[in-house]
């Protein structure tokens, strides 16, 4: 009897990690974020925006796009690619939160946010923790260690694309990873709080927009709305 072949393209009805609890919550959050965006995006159309709002229009939209890209990679089983994108998502979340807590730093953004002028990701995380008076024993560089390893192909990134090969041990996947639910759960567990902050930053930078009637805990997976923010 021939083994059952996996579909070339997965759909929401047969994706490999369908039913994972954290993935379900990721989908709920996407629904809520897209609804919030459908209310927030029009507020950036045809209005004079502050420097902070222009920055937010760009970075929030990019963050949501990356989160949706990660979700599709999970659906198709490309978990390693999703983990690579995670750092880019976290960086945008951190920029939004950092400039919200340190509005005086917007000049660095306006100058191009160049390396050497803008703070590093780990330094922004440390500054955020200090501003919020969080006595965390973990420094920003330690929080980013695994993400940096995956991004820059360091030796300790090896476990993130290992797959079992039966009697032949394990190997490094070059394509879909369909039998590592732990990797799926880990990715979702990191994306969810990051996307929550990005959604909160919509309200922070555009406070006059009413909250969506559908909250995260009540969101129906799959409901969304298009609506790109536009800079002026």
Language-model features, listed with the residues they occupy:
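Short runs of predominantly hydrophobic/aromatic residues within well-ordered alpha helices
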Residues: 56, 82, 86, 140-144
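Short, contiguous, well-structured surface segments enriched in hydrophobic/aromatic residues
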Residues: 32-73, 114
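"Short basic amphipathic alpha-helical interaction patches in structured regions
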Residues: 85-87, 103-112
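Short, hydrophobic, well-ordered secondary-structure elements
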Residues: 60-101
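Long, charged low-complexity segments
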Residues: 1-47, 108-232
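Residue-level recognition of alpha-helical structural elements
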Residues: 52, 75-82, 105, 136
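Short, charged N-terminal helix-start/capping segments
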Residues: 1-21, 55-77
